[in-house]
Amino acid sequence: MQVTETKSEGLKREFQVVLAAAELEDRLTTELAGMKDKVQLKGFRPGKVPVAHLRRVYGRSIMADVVQNAVNEANQKILEENKLKLALEPQIKMPEDKAEIEKALDAKADLAFQVALEVMPTFELQDHSDITVTKPVATVSDEEVETALKRMAEQSRSYADRPEGSAAETGDRVVIDFVGRIGGETFEGGSAEDADLDLGSNTFIPGFEDQLLGAKAGEARTVTVTFPEGYPAEHLAGKEAVFDVTVKAVKAPGEAQIDDELAKTFGLENLDALKDAVRKSLANELDAQSRRRVKKALLDALDARYAFDLPPTLVHQEFAAVWAQVEADLKSRGKTFEDEGTTEEKAQGEYRRIAERRVRLGLVLAQVGETADIKVPDEEVNQALIARLRQFPGQEREVYDFYRKNPQAMAELRAPLFEEKVVDHVLGQVKLVEEPVSKEALFADDEDEAAEAAAPASEAGASKGVISEGVISEGSAPSHETGAA
């Protein structure tokens, strides 16, 4: 087997592989000889079938296997001798001349084919000890605990029927039957019976609740509303609907009590236990946000520190995933790029830079994880799988079977776990400085990003430092199966 490099441009490599006719003949003969004692043919005793006869019967099919094995060996030889890591599966180009292939399959001519590769970049991991990352830290105030308790009490309070003839007010709960029509025709999801609606909660279509203010039990009303342009059900978006509504009951909210009884509705012994649980829950929220801010700052620092060529196809695939999300978001909101103050061309440029950032950070974190021999225990992957199953009540068995039979799906569960471990590892190398901040300051960046996210050209999606699942994977170079994050 003769291997010659014919192209080396950036991360693209091409090689010509030549299998001599004599080598093809030797490989075929070896394979046929190995079959001799295993094949049973009519008219021959076991193990006595002549190799020449086997060649006449099986030669072509065995030669196809010989060629495939040779291609695999050539790929492995190229990677090992040149110390390359693949970004994508090799592209094999066989001769276009069928007569040439026929001769090679008969071992009467050499077989020459091309191998095109897109490889991973090589770069040296740097010393990260000079990186300083600020960790914003906020604490839970007594006022925040009280506010949360009031909200829980309001959500848990009971409702009692108002006196007969009472008109519904903001804050009341009405029990209604309704049938909605668009153009005189009913539509799926537009009807319900005994539905509870808290007036002022803004849980129904804008304008629906307002038209029930003043209604009395037993009263029938016609409510006319228009579905928002960005309504999730696209077939309803922007359309006017008329609802025939029957008010069956008007109920007033009871007093919101913050006491031991409230705690018991949440399965806790007393109010003190509820306060502790609320404080812990709020603290967990602050800790999670602090983690997001720290991770973002770290990834920003790594992104600024590393510069190397990126596999074009990986970037293209990552961009395609991100861009699909952008287009879906615009469509769901009924917006265009012009509505957001940009153009499609400009937005594509910005999101291509986001894709490049994600791929670059994925490669850096993957190499850090490989160098540090970071592993994700199977137990943690199983816990992630259980959490995923809980998202599909009633379908747990089907979802479980899907993951167990789909290695790529399991890899997508493992990837974020691996990423967090790698981030923790790098955080252990940098200088982490805690900075006390208010809750408002801690979440300020999220508010800024939410505002930016409305504009397709913003980097809000990438500024959170999210590496798409599949770009970074445990114990290996990044996969070419990128997903959106």
Curated annotation (Swiss-Prot):
Q: Does the keyword DNA repair apply?
A: no
Q: Where is this region: Disordered?
A: 443-485
Family that this chain belongs to? Belongs to the FKBP-type PPIase family. Tig subfamily.
Provide this UniProt record's keywords sorted from A to Z.
Cell cycle, Cell division, Chaperone, Cytoplasm, Isomerase, Rotamase
Q: Which domain of life is it from?
A: Bacteria
Q: Which organism is it from?
A: Methylobacterium sp. (strain 4-46)
Stretches of Low complexity bias are at 452-462
Domain PPIase FKBP-type: where? Answer: 171-256
Q: What is this protein called?
A: Trigger factor
What biological-process GO terms show up in the record? 'de novo' cotranslational protein folding; cell division; chaperone-mediated protein folding; protein transport; protein unfolding
Compartment(s) where it occurs, according to its Swiss-Prot or TrEMBL record: Cytoplasm
- What does the domain comment read? Consists of 3 domains; the N-terminus binds the ribosome, the middle domain has PPIase activity, while the C-terminus has intrinsic chaperone activity on its own.
Q: Which GO terms describe its cellular component?
A: cytoplasm
